[in-house]
Structures are given as structure tokens and as C-alpha cells.
């Protein structure tokens, strides 16, 4: 009877120990489950950070590409403006040459007109002189008449030359007015081009500053990309480490669950054995 009681006490103690161990294992399992959830949350946080870093890298690269495109477009516009300025400069030079030629023709026409006027005045003076003289000699008269005819011819020729010179002068004046109008237009265009050139110069300076700033931003972007890439690698390493920790915790949880199941089986076996022992005692 004492041996049965001792056995019962031992079994009861073993049952209590098994129950306590099962409770401890269950508590450990809960702690491991909490650690598992915590590690899983950390892993999710790191994955979210990795995605954010990747998004930030993509945004920086897009901004860098956009800045490069704007710089290329600005350089293209500056090149077109310089070509237009060069074309207008050539046109102005041609207009100046045309104006110089027109001025030369006008000077030549004025000289010829002066010569014709002097010849006409000289003929008129000769004619008046001949008219005031009283010459009875027929030969002298004939000579004078011939001189008068010649003078008239010279006067008529001078008048024709004068008319022709006047006509050419009028045409030249019209050409000169047109040339002056074109010159004024050219001067106005030159002013506009100088203003555009000044603006282009300012824009070029701004572009140089923008290019320097773009280079600085590009260097900053490259440094940021390197930093983000390094952070991404670190985050990936930590995420991989977190996954390994989670896997390790999962294995530990599986082991504890197996131990808990084993202890529960052992507890049921001890309980069955106690029930059998109590039944035997009751039968006595």
C-alpha cells in the first residue's frame, strides 16, 4: 500500500512537473510567437523602406534626366539664335555695300549735271555776247550763226543730259530712299538683334550657371544615388538577416510545439496511468 502511495505521489509529482513544464513551454511558445511577430514586423518595415528607397532612387534619376533634356534644348535654342544673328549680319553688310554703290552713282551724276550746267551757261553767255555785237561781215555773221547753232546744239544736248541726269537722279533718289528705308529697317533689326543677342548672352550666362548647378546637382544626385544604393544594400542585408532570424524563430517555434505536443502526450499518459491506479485502489 505504501509503495502504491509513493508511486501515486511520484506520478502526481511527475504530472505536476509535466504540467508545469507544459505551461512553461506554452509560455515560451507565446514569447517566441511574439518575437516571431516582432521580427516579421521589422522585416516588413525593412521591405517597405527598401521600396521607398528604390522609389526615391527612381525619382532622382528621372529628375536628373529631365534636367539634362532641358539643358540640351536650351543649347539648341542658343545655337539657332547665333545662326540667325550671323545671317542678319551678312544681310546688313550687303545693304551697306548697296548703299555705298548708290552713293557713288549719285556723286557721279551730280558731277555730270554740274558740267552740263556750266556748258549751258557758257553757251548762253556767248550767245548774248554775239547778239550785242554789231558785225557787218557776212563771214563773221555766218561764223557767229554757226557758233549759235553749235551753242544751241550744245545747250539742247546739255538740256537732254540734264533731263537724263535729273531722271537718273530721281531714280537714284528713289533708290536712295529705299536704301535708307532698308537701312533704317536694318538698323532697327540690328537693335532688335543686339537686344536678342544681349538676351541670348544673358541666357547663355544663365545656362552656364544652370549647367554648373546641374553638374553640382548631378554630382549630388550621384552621391545620393550611391548613398541610397549603399543603404539599399544594407537594407537588403538586414532584410535577409531578418528573414534568417524569422526562419530560425520558426524552427524554434516548431521545436517548442513538438515538445509541447510530446509533453501533452506524456501528460495524458500519466493521467491515464493515475486513473488506472485510482481504479485499482478503489477496487481494494
From Swiss-Prot:
InterPro entries: Tropomyosin. Residues 111-140 have a biased composition (Basic and acidic residues). Residues 97-140 are annotated as: Disordered. Residues 101-110 have a biased composition (Polar residues). The keyword Repeat applies. Residues 1-284 form a coiled coil. The keyword Nucleotide-binding does not apply. Keywords: Coiled coil, Repeat. The molecule is in a coiled coil structure that is formed by 2 polypeptide chains. The sequence exhibits a prominent seven-residues periodicity. Homodimer. Belongs to the tropomyosin family. Tropomyosin, in association with the troponin complex, plays a central role in the calcium dependent regulation of muscle contraction. PANTHER family: TROPOMYOSIN (PTHR19269). This is Tropomyosin. It comes from Echinococcus multilocularis.
Amino acid at each position: 500500500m505504501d509503495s502504491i502511495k509513493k508511486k501515486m505521489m511520484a506520478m502526481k509529482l511527475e504530472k505536476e512537473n509535466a504540467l508545469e513544464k507544459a505551461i512553461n513551454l506554452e509560455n515560451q511558445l507565446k514569447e517566441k510567437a511574439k518575437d516571431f511577430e516582432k521580427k516579421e514586423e521589422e522585416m516588413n518595415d525593412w521591405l517597405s523602406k527598401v521600396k521607398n528607397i528604390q522609389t526615391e532612387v527612381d525619382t532622382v534619376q528621372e529628375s536628373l534626366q529631365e534636367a539634362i533634356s532641358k539643358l540640351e534644348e536650351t543649347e539648341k535654342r542658343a545655337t539657332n539664335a547665333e545662326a540667325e544673328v550671323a545671317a542678319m549680319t551678312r544681310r546688313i553688310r550687303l545693304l551697306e555695300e548697296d548703299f555705298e554703290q548708290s552713293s557713288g552713282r549719285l556723286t557721279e551724276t551730280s558731277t555730270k549735271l554740274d558740267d552740263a550746267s556750266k556748258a549751258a551757261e557758257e553757251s548762253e553767255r556767248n550767245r548774248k555776247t554775239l547778239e550785242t555785237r554789231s558785225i557787218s561781215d557776212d563771214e563773221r555773221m555766218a561764223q557767229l550763226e554757226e557758233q549759235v547753232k553749235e551753242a544751241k546744239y550744245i545747250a539742247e544736248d546739255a538740256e537732254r543730259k540734264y533731263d537724263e541726269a535729273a531722271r537718273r537722279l530721281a531714280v537714284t533718289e528713289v533708290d536712295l530712299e529705299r536704301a535708307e528705308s532698308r537701312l533704317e529697317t536694318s538698323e532697327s533689326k540690328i537693335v532688335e538683334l543686339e537686344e536678342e543677342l544681349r538676351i541670348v548672352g544673358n541666357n547663355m550666362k544663365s545656362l552656364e550657371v544652370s549647367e554648373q548647378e546641374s553638374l553640382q546637382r548631378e554630382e549630388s544626385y550621384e552621391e545620393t544615388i550611391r548613398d541610397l544604393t549603399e543603404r539599399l544594400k544594407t537594407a537588403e542585408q538586414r532584410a535577409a538577416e531578418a528573414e534568417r532570424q524569422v526562419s530560425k524563430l520558426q524552427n524554434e517555434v516548431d521545436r517548442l510545439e513538438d515538445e509541447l505536443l510530446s509533453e501533452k502526450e506524456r501528460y495524458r499518459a500519466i493521467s491515464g496511468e493515475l486513473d488506472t491506479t485510482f481504479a485499482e485502489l478503489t477496487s481494494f
